[in-house]
Each structure stands twice: as structure tokens, then as C-alpha cells.
């Protein structure tokens, strides 16, 4: 049995350096699928520590295919796995925030546990997800937003894919995705499926150089800022850590309806996003997009607080900027020069 697996089975937690070595072994293909499944199961059962998470993140970031970072870009990648089957809120928020002037490096993947992953819905919207590190950077520079399709940037993840799929439950990799943006962004909005996990991720992030990160977990179970219940937030900014909660009413929004933001496929998700940008969607869908885009605008440094960011996002949707931004994102690179 793998020595790290044996240690965890015996109740030990791993130091950061040990966690790094374990992740290297998984990423190198040096562990069997049963060993990988075993370690993921043990960690999920007892709960990961911030030290372990930080060690895993260091390796994931170091091995990511990247051409270097860009200043002041923001990511809206969340953990997923909330089981509520909403449309792709973080993707709609990313497009809206980029329409309002934020530089967005959206990290994401196809669906694993949800009805629609960010890559799935972007394809349905007509946005290319097959991008190299260089073309992502050019897209951010030219269009304010680029999409980093996780399998293209984290090729070593192929060694754990089978074990993850076979396990079928949330593992540490749900937490690692948002923490492993290949451009190593320092500004993020991270939706988390539980507030305990948000606290864990915040503690791990404090071991890295971050400028402004919001981790959000709603009390209705959403891994987003919600319009149907209060949302608990951890904010990391300038070396400080704040915890607080917000409610939809603080932003002038009436309590929304979950059924208005739920979908059964990536096609439905894409259609709802198009309707939001065309000002034809239910108010719940509009408001939840504005709220989450507002958080991205705020963490990008373009608003003084979440309320101002949300107001800016709402205007970007209502005045057609978000719809026009989606059309820009659909353009191929050569068409931008035509």
C-alpha cells in the first residue's frame, strides 16, 4: 500500500511537503487507480486540512501549462457540486463582468456532477473552448475574457480521471479546480458548496499571494451568491480576512425563485443566458447574474464594494453591453482583425 495512503488510513494528516509528494505521484501516474480512489475516499471521509490543500495546489499550479500570468485578471470558477442544477451562473457572470471592463480568465471544465459545465455551455453559446495559453492571453487582451479549458492546461489530471469518475462523489479535486487557475490569478470569486469548505479553502489561499478573493456559499445550498437566501462570504483582501453575510434585499432585489434558475441541460442553460442578455429572462435569473458579476467587478478592483459592482453589472446587462460582449467572444481571432 502507498505510504501516504497508509498514513491517512491510520489517521494521520499530511504536512504540506508530504501532500506535494503525494500529488506528484498522482500526477505522474505512479499510483494505481485503486490507490488513488483510496486516498481520495479517505480524505473525503475525514476532511482535508489547509496544509494538505496548499500542498496539492502548489503542485497543480506548478504543472499547469501556462505562458505566464496577466496583471489584475479575475476568475469566477467555483467548486460546483451543489446538486441544485442551476444554469451556469459563474459563466454568465464572467461574460457580464468582462462586458463591464474586468479582465476575466475563466477556468472551467465539462460537467462532472452537474447538468452543464462551463465548457459545455460556452460551446452551446458558440464560444470556442479549444485555446492555447497564448491564444487565451490574446483573447483577454483583445476581448477582456479568455476561457481556460482545464484538460488542455492540466494534462496530468488524466491519471486521476478514471478514479474520480468511478467514485462518483465530491473529492478534494472539486476544491482544487478553483485554486489551480493556470494563470495563477490573484483575484477571484469562488463559489463553494459548503461554508466549512470555504473556510478551508480560504486558509489554504492565505499561504499564497492573493490580492482580492471572495469565497461565497449560500444558505440554500448554492455555490454562488444567491437571490433566494442569505450568502455567507469570506473576503481575503490586502492581508486581511473578513467573514460576513449578505441578503438579496441589500441590493434592492426581491427574494427570488430557484425554479426560475434551474435547467436540465447545457442547451437550456445557454438559452437562459441568451435571454438574460436580451433582457427577456425572469428577474431571478437577471438578479443572480448581476450579483455574481458584481462580485467579479468588485474583486477586479473596478468597484468600491459589492453593491456598486452589482449596480455596474446590472447596467451592463440592461444596456446591451453583455449581449454585445457575448457576440465578441464568439468571433474567431482572425475575424477580430478583419
Curated annotation (Swiss-Prot):
Anthranilate 2 binds at residue 164. Binds 2 magnesium ions per monomer. 5-phospho-alpha-D-ribose 1-diphosphate binds at residues 78, 81-82, 86, 88-91, 106-114, 118. Anthranilate 1 binds at residues 78, 109. It holds the Pfam family Glycos_transf_3. It is an enzyme of class 2 (transferase). Its cofactor is Mg(2+). Pathway: Amino-acid biosynthesis; L-tryptophan biosynthesis; L-tryptophan from chorismate: step 2/5. Keywords: Amino-acid biosynthesis, Aromatic amino acid biosynthesis, Glycosyltransferase, Magnesium, Metal-binding, Transferase, Tryptophan biosynthesis. It comes from the Bacteria. GO terms for cellular component: cytosol. The keyword Oxidoreductase does not apply. It catalyses: N-(5-phospho-beta-D-ribosyl)anthranilate + diphosphate = 5-phospho-alpha-D-ribose 1-diphosphate + anthranilate. GO terms for biological process: L-tryptophan biosynthetic process. Gene3D superfamilies: Nucleoside phosphorylase/phosphoribosyltransferase catalytic domain (3.40.1030.10), Transferase, Pyrimidine Nucleoside Phosphorylase, Chain C (1.20.970.10). Mg(2+) 1 binds at residues 90, 224. Its EC number is 2.4.2.18. InterPro entries: Anthranilate_Pribosyl_Tfrase, Glycosyl_Trfase_fam3, Glycosyl_Trfase_fam3_N_dom, Glycosyl_Trfase_fam3_N_dom_sf, Nuc_phospho_transferase. The keyword Amino-acid biosynthesis applies. NCBIfam families: trpD. Belongs to the anthranilate phosphoribosyltransferase family. Homodimer. Catalyzes the transfer of the phosphoribosyl group of 5-phosphorylribose-1-pyrophosphate (PRPP) to anthranilate to yield N-(5'-phosphoribosyl)-anthranilate (PRA). This is Anthranilate phosphoribosyltransferase.
